[in-house]
From Swiss-Prot:
Belongs to the ATPase alpha/beta chains family. The gene is atpB. Coiled coil: none annotated. SMART domains: AAA. Pfam families: ATP-synt_ab, ATP-synt_ab_N, ATP-synt_VA_C. Keywords: ATP synthesis, ATP-binding, CF(1), Chloroplast, Hydrogen ion transport, Ion transport, Membrane, Nucleotide-binding, Plastid, Thylakoid, Translocase, Transport. The lineage of its organism: Eukaryota, Viridiplantae, Chlorophyta, Mamiellophyceae, Mamiellales. This is ATP synthase subunit beta, chloroplastic. It is a peripheral membrane protein. Its EC number is 7.1.2.2. One of its GO terms (molecular function) is ATP hydrolysis activity. PROSITE patterns: ATPASE_ALPHA_BETA. It is an enzyme of class 7 (translocase). GO terms for cellular component: chloroplast thylakoid membrane; mitochondrion; proton-transporting ATP synthase complex. It comes from Ostreococcus tauri.
Length: 483
């Protein structure tokens, strides 16, 4: 939280509409935009109330309009509002690892206060200067076949996981954090921002991290991740700012400790949604599909800070909810522009039981270039895409006339495409309880070798079910022997 100024600038509440608070201050003593203000007092039954809000508008007649970061229950007109004189500030540094925070930087895991020898940093900061940015191109291996082969992630880049409700965005994020031990292999730390998602998911993630020792409950100093949560039940102000709280913690590790940081955001759409709610509460005219007119600016102010400098990097993996599975909706469409790689999850593949339900033809990456990946990887990826694209084109003919009406060449393409489609599935560590199969980490070299063998016709005699939910190609051959 923000330390109060010695000479307090005090106002009074004049109006409360849900999470929006209007307060009047003395002339020439108005708080600045983005200053945090604190309201303390007692409600009707004598309970102490403390509410923190962020100034959003100066309305004239010495009145400011602020958006609350917590519930406004029990607040009354006439209550004292204290201007802290600064933006909301949150704790940073190694003591944040292994802990769970809310938007204000207050620990909510009942493990006591956080000592912050490194101090506090304001959540509103400028993006790094253009000359300080790092332009190095290298791949970030995840151990997930479909990702590493067809839409590889850039180390120090921004990655979006796009999908509608219930197709597996959160499971994919949990897999990337927990059981790949990316944070450990990466030699850095992770920060997880839970933006407007379910409390149950936040709790599940914490338990998973404790079990896999990403969070070491016995010795928090050995932990590799800090968690920042602003769930669905929080006011829109908290959901709109919790991403910035997490980003501020990540920036400290990058800029001061010169570390490589992984920033996970689940879900960036809720950040936009909260901004839309706040925009409406502040009386702004909505733009397309009811979104806030400042959508691009808000998204840019967050995304431009998630970047890699010459001293450290932030690799960001963001889940993006796609309303009604419509990728042209303004929220996902605005997010697309900022990303280096997009992993699109498909409801059709999920319905077929192919998990992770990543659409190999819709997913893209700026890293899929022969001069970055090498010809072997690039040619295999293109071969897989061409085979799947041809299969997609033939599906209408197959539905009407059946497989028998296809030419010999097309029948072979379809058989290989179906094997490729199944081989793109993979058992996850975090989904062991659902699949009954132990999780698998498949190296990039193994992935390339497996797909080359399928496309080259070396495995034409194996049944397609042998390729379903296995790790590398050797496991598929073993499974075929048992069928």
């Amino acid at each position: 939280m923000t330390a109060l100024k010695t000479e307090q600038n005090i106002g009074r509440i004049t109006q409360i509409i849900g999470p929006v608070i209007d307060a009047v201050f003395s002339p020439n003593k108005m708080p600045n935009i983005y200053n945090s203000v604190v309201i303390e007092g007692k409600n009707d039954v004598g309970d102490t109330i403390k509410c923190v809000a962020e100034v959003q508008q100066l309305l004239g007649d010495n009145v400011v309009r602020a958006v609350s970061m917590s519930a406004t229950d029990g607040l009354m007109r006439g209550m004292t509002v204290v201007d802290t004189g600064a933006a909301l500030s949150v704790p940073v540094g190694k003591n944040t690892l292994g802990r769970i925070f809310n938007v204000l930087g207050e620990p909510v895991d009942e493990l006591g206060a956080v000592s912050t020898p490194e101090g506090m940093l304001p959540i509103h900061r400028a993006a790094p200067a253009f000359v300080d940015l790092d332009t190095n191109l290298s791949i970030f291996e995840t151990g997930i076949k479909v990702v590493d082969l067809l839409a590889p992630y850039r180390r120090g880049g921004k990655i979006g996981l796009f999908g509608g409700a219930g197709v597996g965005k959160t499971v994919l994020i949990m897999e990337l954090i927990v059981n790949n031990n990316i944070a450990k292999a990466h030699g850095g730390v992770s920060v997880f921002a839970g933006v407007g998602e379910r409390t149950r998911e936040g709790n599940d993630l914490y338990q998973e991290m404790c079990e896999s020792k990403v969070i070491d409950t016995a010795n928090l100093a050995n932990s590799k991740v800090a968690l920042v949560y602003g769930q669905m039940n929080e006011p829109p102000g908290a959901r709109m700012r919790v991403g910035l709280t997490a980003l501020t913690m990540a920036e400290y590790f990058r800029d001061v400790n010169n570390q490589d940081v992984l920033l996970f955001v689940d879900n960036i759409f809720r950040f936009v949604q909260a901004g839309s709610e706040v925009s409406a509460l502040l009386g702004r005219m909505p733009s397309a599909v009811g979104y806030q007119p400042t959508l691009s600016t808000e998204m840019g102010s967050l995304q431009e800070r998630i970047t890699s400098t010459k001293t450290g990097s932030i690799t960001s993996i963001q889940a993006v909810y796609v309303p009604a599975d419509d990728l042209t909706d303004p929220a996902p469409a605005t997010t697309f522009a900022h990303l280096d790689a997009t992993t699109v999850l498909s409801r059709n593949l999920a319905a077929k039981g192919i998990y992770p339900a990543v659409d190999p033809l819709d997913s893209t990456s700026t890293m899929l270039q022969p001069w970055i990946l090498g010809d072997d990887h690039y040619d295999t990826a293109q071969g897989v895409k061409q085979t799947l694209q041809r299969y997609k084109e033939l599906q209408d003919i197959i539905a009407i006339l059946g497989l028998d009406e296809l030419s010999e060449e097309d029948r072979l393409t379809v058989a290989r495409a179906r094997k490729v489609e199944r081989f793109l599935s993979q058992p996850f560590f975090v989904a062991e309880v659902f699949t009954g199969s132990p999780g698998k980490y498949v190296s990039l070299a193994e992935s390339i070798q497996g797909f080359k063998m399928i496309l080259g016709g070396e495995l034409d005699d194996l049944p397609e079910q042998a390729f379903y939910l296995v790790g590398n190609i050797d496991e598929a051959v073993e499974k075929a022997a048992k069928l």
